[in-house]
Structures are given as C-alpha cells and as structure tokens.
Amino acid sequence: MNLDNQSKYLIGQIISDKRDKTVTVRIDRKVKHPLYGKIITRSKKYHAHDEHNQYKVGDVVAISEARPISKTKSWRVIKVVKIN
C-alpha cells in the first residue's frame, strides 16, 4: 500500500503478537522537557488488526486508522517497514 494515500498513519514497533489477529504496536515520539530542555522519549501503545497473523514481535510497521473493530482496536496494519 502507498502511504501517501492514507489519511493518518503512524510508524512503530510490534511489542506483542500473542492475540489472534491483533498486534500491539508501540509508537515513540520525542518531546522536549518544558523546564530543562532535555529531549525525552514518550511512547504510546495501540492495538492494531493483523488479518493474517503475519507480523511478528520486533517488526517495524505502519498502522492506519480504521473503523472500530473491537473495544480497544481501531487501527490496522497497512505495511511492514522493516522486518526484524
């Protein structure tokens, strides 16, 4: 898939693939501390839909917004960026 056509996508690393058709993706971002100015890494975890259970822990993937698939899952994996 072409990432240019996606409305919103994020790139992150898969940290869990234990559930059926679901992966947990950690998205890291860099922020500057408001007082001290140090660059800090903040992260957030998203559950994403993996239809064919083809992605493994350590893979870097792009995820895109989708309709709600379950209570906590409203993202889907659109392509692998780097295979571990």
From Swiss-Prot:
The organism's place on the tree of life at top rank: Bacteria
GO CC annotations on file: cytosolic small ribosomal subunit
Molecular function as annotated in GO: rRNA binding; structural constituent of ribosome
GO biological process: one example: translation
PROSITE patterns in the cross-refs: RIBOSOMAL_S17
Keywords: Ribonucleoprotein, Ribosomal protein, RNA-binding, rRNA-binding
InterPro entries the UniProt entry points to: NA-bd_OB-fold, Ribosomal_uS17, Ribosomal_uS17_bact/chlr, Ribosomal_uS17_CS
Family label: Belongs to the universal ribosomal protein uS17 family.
Quaternary structure annotation from Swiss-Prot or TrEMBL: Part of the 30S ribosomal subunit.
Described purpose of this protein according to its UniProt entry: One of the primary rRNA binding proteins, it binds specifically to the 5'-end of 16S ribosomal RNA.
Protein name, UniProt field: Small ribosomal subunit protein uS17
Organismal lineage: Bacteria, Pseudomonadati, Pseudomonadota, Betaproteobacteria, Nitrosomonadales
